[in-house]
Amino acid sequence: MSDHKESTGAIALTLPDRSVRNVAMGSTGYDVALSIGRKLAQDALAIKLNGVVCDLNTLINSDAAIEIITFTSPEGPEIFWHSSSHLMAQAIEELFAGSKFGAGPAIEQGFYYDVSSEHRFREEDLRAIEARMLEISKRDSSVQRQEMSREEAIAFFTSVRNDPYKVEILTETLKNVERVSLYHQGDFTDLCTGPHLPSTGKIKAVLLTNISASYWRGDSNREQMQRIYGITFPSEKLLKEHVARIEEAKRRDHRKLGAELELFLLSPEVGSGLPMWLPKGAIIRSELESFLREEQRKRGYVPVYTPHIGNIELYKRSGHYPYYSDSQFPPLTYHDEDGKQEQYLLKPMNCPHHHLIYSSKMRSYRDLPLRFTEFGTVYRHEQSGELNGLARARGFTQDDSHIYCRPDQLVDEICSAIELTQFVFKTLGFAEVQTRLSLHDPANQAKYGGTAEVWEQAEKDVQEAAERMGVDYFIGIGEASFYGPKIDFIVRDAIGRKWQLGTVQVDYVMPERFDLTYVGSDGQKHRPVVIHRAPFGSMERFIGLLIEHTAGNFPLWLAPVQVAVLPIAEENHDYATTVYRRLLAAGIRAELDTRSEKINRKIRDAEMSKTPCMLVIGQKEQANGEVSLRRHRQGDAGRFATDELIETLKQEIANRQ
């Protein structure tokens, strides 16, 4: 194809490699993919035009930057699985007449749909639904987008579909929207913004995984529904690989390993979603906190501490109360001796408290940047069905930092926050990290604080910082927080799963709401910019991930017990005790096993406990002032003089190995 426009009917499309391809005006994304290669056209799911993800059959009528999205693209699985939820709903509708549908999003691993049906779904129903989904896939029905007015959509879902849930969304959630989009495939129609697959035939492999109870709109006072989960793939091979990963994930489940390794406890007597750290788990958490504190000190952060509750007016002022009201614990109401009522909330966020600390005194431009940091515990009343050990809890601790800086310092400070986050992940063994620039949705500006101009500047600064740091990022429209754009870090664990962890967020909104100022070099008051930054995100969730990523095989510096001292016989106990005490004196976490068990049993138990180092002590070692070292999962590493080995271990720990 020519590299230059040959007629007024041609448009220029810039590909990710910056090459330019000229196509006829009115070409679709599929046409463009086919012009590049037949295999790409077969794999194409959707396109990205000027950073916005669109249907593959979208008509392109002007010059644009274009990217063909496949299943391996960052956006690919979400599109695939969202379309699969529609496919599942169609199958359910065909099998169980009268079923109605609530929400059906893509999730981190697959999708779900909330179903209202007189039929109580069972395991055997899932197999029947799977079979019908594959049957519909073979029909290869095209998926068509239709836009209409909100009033037309209400009439359609009232009289044609008889779907009260979609009518409620249209009349309440979308009451200020003039036009909406519907997607049709065969005889099935759903209300959706899209984008979706071009046809049902793209879905080749289906696995429905489980059924749980849910409530319409997450409100326990509303209708109870049945939530059906599933996952799909464009090939059977990918599904088989996924099933193998699931089996491995079960072996690595942090809830299972947490109990086996005595790391944390979840007790119904304390309450659902409120984990307690056992001594070994507390050591891991303490080491991680010490690691981050040390690195933050090097970068000029200063610690603060804030209460676990706050006056409800504080969170109304920040905007967190209306934004998080559905997931907060009920307010605590008190009356003072004069009868005046005060309401308090369990702290849902640390940010407002830090803003008040900033505003507690006048700040000069010379004071900035000012970097506050806190391991602050916050509380969210997550639905019981969404709780998942440490990964989703009701009480969790954030490694929360807020940087207050001048606008001219902003990009440098974002870069510094990116560098710290990357360093943390590298140290902890996460080699694969994706970066998402989470921007706001201009079509839904009312959802966000601040003006369109403020958002434009904030997003420009975030993008500039990411590019300066050489970050290979992708853009997520609509993924921003309500007060600003953010950089989200998504790590891939040892079995290929993706976890969103650290974040760096820019905020022009809170300085306005809290009237934060500094005195500039001109003697006038100016607004600082705030950066919200949390490499771990949540200590609980991060440690849950770390348990699963390592399968409980923590590196030496992080292991709750670093060394097990294993005397072979009773006559070796005194020397073993001396070695044990020297390890403790050197700051090494050690345990001494003086049970009357055979040495092979002691080694096996230490291996099962995933202790990194085992020191076997018999007559030879005792006579020569030595120890025999075994490394976890590696076996015999040789005999060493005790002093020499202690120094070696201290160095490994200091280097965080």
From Swiss-Prot:
Compartment annotation: Cytoplasm
Main location class: cytoplasm
Annotated GO CC locations: cytoplasm
Segments for region (Catalytic): 253-555
Keyword terms, alphabetized: Aminoacyl-tRNA synthetase, ATP-binding, Cytoplasm, Ligase, Metal-binding, Nucleotide-binding, Protein biosynthesis, RNA-binding, tRNA-binding, Zinc
Gene Ontology terms: biological process: threonyl-tRNA aminoacylation
Binding annotation for Zn(2+): 351, 402, 532
Pfam family, one: TGS
Coiled-coil features, chain-numbered ranges: none
Catalytic activity of the protein: tRNA(Thr) + L-threonine + ATP = L-threonyl-tRNA(Thr) + AMP + diphosphate + H(+)
GO MF term (any one): threonine-tRNA ligase activity
Keyword tRNA-binding assigned: yes
CDD domains: TGS_ThrRS, ThrRS_anticodon, ThrRS_core
SMART domains cross-referenced by the UniProt entry: tRNA_SAD (SM00863)
Function as written in the Swiss-Prot or TrEMBL entry: Catalyzes the attachment of threonine to tRNA(Thr) in a two-step reaction: L-threonine is first activated by ATP to form Thr-AMP and then transferred to the acceptor end of tRNA(Thr). Also edits incorrectly charged L-seryl-tRNA(Thr).
Assembly notes: Homodimer.
Protein name according to UniProt: Threonine--tRNA ligase
Organism: Chlorobium chlorochromatii (strain CaD3)
